[in-house]
Amino acid sequence: MLTRFKKQNNKMVRANIVSMVLLMHAIVGFPFHARGLSMTYYMMSCPFAEQIVKNSVNNALQADPTLAAGLIRMLFHDCFIEGCDASILLDSTKDNTAEKDSPANLSLRGYEIIDDAKEKIENRCPGVVSCADIVAMAARDAVFWAGGPYYDIPKGRFDGKRSKIEDTRNLPSPFLNASQLIQTFGQRGFTPQDVVALSGAHTLGVARCSSFKARLTVPDSSLDSTFANTLSKTCSAGDNAEQPFDATRNDFDNAYFNALQMKSGVLFSDQTLFNTPRTRNLVNGYALNQAKFFFDFQQAMRKMSNLDVKLGSQGEVRQNCRSIN
């Protein structure tokens, strides 16, 4: 009972912090427009939109905290393909296999949260709020719910009409080294600092054995021997067996970076960030200073949320997030 009270009290404190942050943004002249988007986009047309999304996210995460990682991963897998246009939500049809049915996306979770928020919003403001905005807001709210930083994002994204399985080949592989990650993300406008900060999202969630078992077949000096035994034990249950990225799988903190320092990164693409001199100092900095990680992460997430957005005639506002109008 005491633990529950403390968690509820912490939520209240964090809510007050959010209010203070938003007030400070207003006072110092926070940029309310970005790339044709606006912080106040729904102020008149659907003022309850953000609260509805937040309620859907909070209710779902209270029932299943592991879904926080799913919502953050959903945003990344959406935005990195064709931009932040909710293409990841479209279902396959008899004439087209959509992104969500790619092997890279089969483990994505949280679609029902987006559906719930969209249905409730449509009941209040039909045809106004895009699915792309809901995905971006849901990821933001999931970060905060799990204990991470609060950040605001501009709204006004339109939903795309294309979702093809072949486009998912552009998603970064868990087998890339740091130089390859920097190159891949750099092509989309991200810095090495962004790459390391965004990788910190792995402080939440799990990886499946199929994504790291190759590290166990040959000696890997970058992998702690005791942790290697842990991974082997996990994989004994099959390719779909799950291994948490760090010791606090449902808490957004800097434990992920501490794990990398101890050669206990689950994915090759995780551990390479510590093994590579170009990114090691960033890992060490975030492991030492969680506040610095939080600040850089929210900046990188704003950038991710604004990636190649569609505006006006470039897209539409779907009535149902799973199909085009």
UniProtKB/Swiss-Prot annotation:
One Gene Ontology biological process: response to oxidative stress
Repeat among keywords: no
Binding site for Ca(2+) 1: D78, G83, D85, S87
Site residues (Transition state stabilizer), renumbered to this chain: R73
GO molecular function annotation: heme binding; lactoperoxidase activity; metal ion binding
Annotated binding of substrate, by residue: P172
The EC number(s) this enzyme carries: 1.11.1.7
Catalytic residues identified in the record: H77 (proton acceptor)
Keywords from the UniProt entry: Calcium, Disulfide bond, Glycoprotein, Heme, Iron, Metal-binding, Oxidoreductase, Peroxidase, Secreted, Signal
CDD domains from the UniProt entry: secretory_peroxidase
PROSITE patterns tied to this protein: PEROXIDASE_1 (PS00435), PEROXIDASE_2 (PS00436), PEROXIDASE_4 (PS50873)
Keyword Translocase found: no
GO cellular component: extracellular region
Residues reported in the UniProt entry to bind Ca(2+) 2: T203, D246, T248, D253
Catalytic activity: 2 a phenolic donor + H2O2 = 2 a phenolic radical donor + 2 H2O
Positions of heme b binding: H202
Function: Removal of H(2)O(2), oxidation of toxic reductants, biosynthesis and degradation of lignin, suberization, auxin catabolism, response to environmental stresses such as wounding, pathogen attack and oxidative stress. These functions might be dependent on each isozyme/isoform in each plant tissue.
PANTHER family hit by this protein: PEROXIDASE 55, PTHR31517
Note: There are 73 peroxidase genes in A.thaliana.
Official protein name in the record: Peroxidase 47
Gene from which this protein is expressed: PER47
